[in-house]
Amino acid sequence: MSQDYYQILGVSKTASSAELKKAYHKLAKQYHPDNAAAGDTNAEKKFKEINAAYDVLKDEQKRAAYDRFGHDAFQNQQSRRGAGGGTSSFHPDINDIFGDFFSDFMGGSRRSRPTSSKVRGSDLKYDLTINLEEAFHGIEKNISFSSEVQCDTCHGNGSEKGETITTCDACSGVGVTRIQQGFFTIEQTCHKCQGNGQMIKNPCKKCHGMGRYHKQRNLLVNIPAGVENGTRIRHTGEGEAGIRGGNSGDLYVDISIKPHDIYKVDGANLHCKLPISFVNAALGGEVEVPIIEGGKVNLTIPAGTQNGDQLRLRSKGMSKMRSTIRGDMLTHIHVEVPKNLSKRQRELLEEFKKESMSEKENDSSFFNKMKSLWS
């Protein structure tokens, strides 16, 4: 007995819709071809089984019919189809089986499956690394990647120039053929046109009838000002070209921002370490601070500033996408104590030390902290 759909999803037959959905998403993520190792055919097979199982069990009517007739009944239909000897490529779609079941026994009308030889191209992802200044100002970047592009010889239709594309006479352009199996009417992909519904007598030599071919591409992409690390930018229609004139997929550019030597980013705010002399910390003053847009601004240091204090420069942080508002820059004060003193400097500090020791100052003052370090 082959594994039924409940076993494939790892749930009981009484599982709720929410439990089915949770199990499906977990398994689909695990066995998705993008996450599987290259050449892992077992993962691809498992992924198809998971999708087929969930497609039936998520639908209440299909699930009821499946529970009634069972998985083996479905498998037996396949066995009888190949019982005449030789090989068979018969792989009926469970949707077709249940679709015809409800059509024949519940008075519904079976709709013809819409088919087309046109297939949308795949989406592409490109990882782009920029620096913080580029993220602040915005920039245009020329990126290079390879993808399927529309054939410029046949203009995407897959046929040699001047040749016509005809409707498949085996399936009348539907892309599927029907066979009767007892009370089931089963559809299978047309063997003549491979489900395209059309026949190309003389395929284009450049693209071998696919309407596209592989090529190295260059594209100028615009990175807006204020872009954040991890931002994904969509470029509609810049993915892989579709098959036989199908719509192109999209290109997704994922942004990574390099770490900066001076600034650390926190949303739209910037943080930086600002070294100042102990004289400026004690007496106050002004120091020049570099800003992200280039140049410097003056920052006022209040008298008595302590090591580790934080001073804010408003609207000197990062720009925000699609906004005129900017973040702030927060400077973290680091008081530097001189290591090499001149004779005169030492004399002045010794004099200051004597005067300080004769006074009763608050233990948390800057100068008492300095005395405790020097004692």
From Swiss-Prot:
Localization: Cytoplasm
Entries under CDD domains matching the protein: DnaJ (cd06257), DnaJ_C (cd10747)
Zinc finger (CR-type): 138-216
Cofactor or coenzyme needed: Zn(2+)
Cross-referenced SMART domains: DnaJ (SM00271)
Cellular-component GO terms for this entry: cytoplasm
GO biological process: one example: protein refolding
Binding-site positions, Zn(2+) 2: 168, 171, 190, 193
Cofactor mode of binding and number, as noted: Binds 2 Zn(2+) ions per monomer.
CXXCXGXG motif repeats: 151-158, 168-175, 190-197, 204-211
Keyword line: Chaperone, Cytoplasm, DNA replication, Metal-binding, Repeat, Stress response, Zinc, Zinc-finger
Residues involved in Zn(2+) 1 binding: 151, 154, 204, 207
Reported function: Participates actively in the response to hyperosmotic and heat shock by preventing the aggregation of stress-denatured proteins and by disaggregating proteins, also in an autonomous, DnaK-independent fashion. Unfolded proteins bind initially to DnaJ; upon interaction with the DnaJ-bound protein, DnaK hydrolyzes its bound ATP, resulting in the formation of a stable complex. GrpE releases ADP from DnaK; ATP binding to DnaK triggers the release of the substrate protein, thus completing the reaction cycle.
Domain notes per entry: The J domain is necessary and sufficient to stimulate DnaK ATPase activity. Zinc center 1 plays an important role in the autonomous, DnaK-independent chaperone activity of DnaJ. Zinc center 2 is essential for interaction with DnaK and for DnaJ activity.
Protein name from the UniProt record: Chaperone protein DnaJ
Gene: dnaJ
